[in-house]
């Protein structure tokens, strides 16, 4: 506030200096204003400034940032305005002296045509004006002084405008602080609140004032200047400004039949068509004068200075509210004017049944806006129900404001329709752009994720499964089953007694290492190299067949026929054994072994197939090597028994 005071004080001092420095020879046009205007302007400024300070002191929560922003905006706008005017004045001044010198030359073209000669005169007169005005520094200084005076006067006018910092409370408990000047209407303030609160702009929104002393509430009309009624509040007032929805604000235009056809049945009024409503509005609001609802009925009137209420028969007229002291007579000579609507407003009252012992809680009052406390000039009325109270209050508003009320309603409808259309466009754009994409992607991902893993797992299992089935077929015959489980490193090794379990799991382990050779007997052979007793290992001709070897290994007993071969000496030199193994197949008769293991048993001694390659590759089964010696001896004994048997 100190900065603002200093700014305006400097401005006034500058004006004083400028007015003193002006000479009497200056043109009367710019100098005529300063002598007559400065004194009243200074007084007006001081009054407006005092009101401004009072408004800041009255309100506790004032938004100084918004206040300074508005002041700076107003000052900058006026400065820009006068800067542009100064530029235009400078541009237009040189044209004036040019025609003064060659008057005879330029008089004719000017008379012929206004547009063409203007361009020619400007082009020809451009050179002469500079010398005429360049030397006239005094005139330029005078012009600058005049511009400064105009700018100062404009700023004074802006400062003279009453401005109030208003705290508006909203229904959700929040509040907004606004700076309002006397030129703004309630409609302008509501538009500002719509932008700040982002609420829907329906026609029911209202700016209301509440008076806790009188327990009253009134919705400001959209065309009213908000500063005017607020400036009547006292310094210590507890009045509040609210921003809330009031359904009865424009109910007369939504359902005019309720107010103009109130004597008819209420049920029939609700079913009126829209065309009939529009016609009713045209008849009452679009004519030369507005027709006020013809309301009449019994109301309770509070006596002055007492808490007693008397029934009176009231009639509503365009000029005011009348009642009949003699029953229900309607003769004009018998009517008494209770109040005229020119200088009063209508207010809703709250809890008057407790405060003034009213017959009901549906009360309203008529009073001057400057009356802020109880007074004998306030007229209190009480109705039987809420419907009749809204009927009378709305009728009084129509009688007071006339067509202006209808114009306010149409402006509110335009504002609401515009905001609604814009909101619908934004909602449609956002919904169409965002909704379709996520669902199909999620479904596709969920659908494909489970399928590929299942397919991958199935083929892998199938590749490992082919060897097991033959092993399952040969599992029952092997007698040395208890000894065979230890060799496989699989977890099923501990359960030695269950032959089927061990065989199935053993089959799973051998297949992976045997893939390179496709012969399963080598795994037992891997165990055979470490033990010295296996002399029959050379007899592995039956291992040449891929299917039987896995079965033999699983059974243990049938796999023994191939290892028993006598050439044990071939084990130390495994490399040469590879070559010999390749040539060994022809001498023995291996073809019969695929169908049955018997032929393979008959020819093991004759065919010495050194399957040394598998042992080096088979490193995992080394853990079972120590037990492999005894196992192989038992296998050899079993094979010998089988050989002896015809």
Curated annotation (Swiss-Prot):
PANTHER family reported in the protein's UniProt record:
AMYLOID BETA A4 PRECURSOR PROTEIN-BINDING FAMILY B MEMBER 1-INTERACTING PROTEIN, GROWTH FACTOR RECEPTOR-BOUND PROTEIN
Where mainly found?
membrane
Q: Name one GO cellular component term.
A: cytosol
| Bias type Low complexity, positions | 429-445
Name by which UniProt lists this protein: Amyloid beta A4 precursor protein-binding family B member 1-interacting protein
Where does this protein reside within or beyond the cell? Cell membrane; Cytoplasm, Cytoskeleton
Q: Bias regions of kind Polar residues — which residues?
A: 101-116
Segments forming domain Ras-associating: 162-248
Keyword annotations from UniProtKB, A to Z = Cell membrane, Cytoplasm, Cytoskeleton, Membrane
Q: Where is the composition biased (Pro residues)?
A: 465-500, 509-536, 560-577, 584-598
Describe its membrane topology.
Answer: Peripheral membrane protein
Q: Residue ranges of the PH domain? A: 292-401
| Database matches in SUPFAM superfamilies | PH domain-like (SSF50729), Ubiquitin-like (SSF54236)
Taxonomic source organism:
Danio rerio
The record's comment on protein family reads: Belongs to the MRL family.
What InterPro entries has UniProt attached to this entry? GRB/APBB1IP, PH-like_dom_sf, PH_APBB1IP, PH_domain, RA_dom, Ubiquitin-like_domsf
Protein's job? Appears to function in the signal transduction from Ras activation to actin cytoskeletal remodeling.
- Give me the ranges of the annotated region Disordered: 82-141, 420-646
**PROSITE patterns in the cross-refs:** PH_DOMAIN, RA
Q: Give GO BP annotations, semicolon-separated.
A: signal transduction
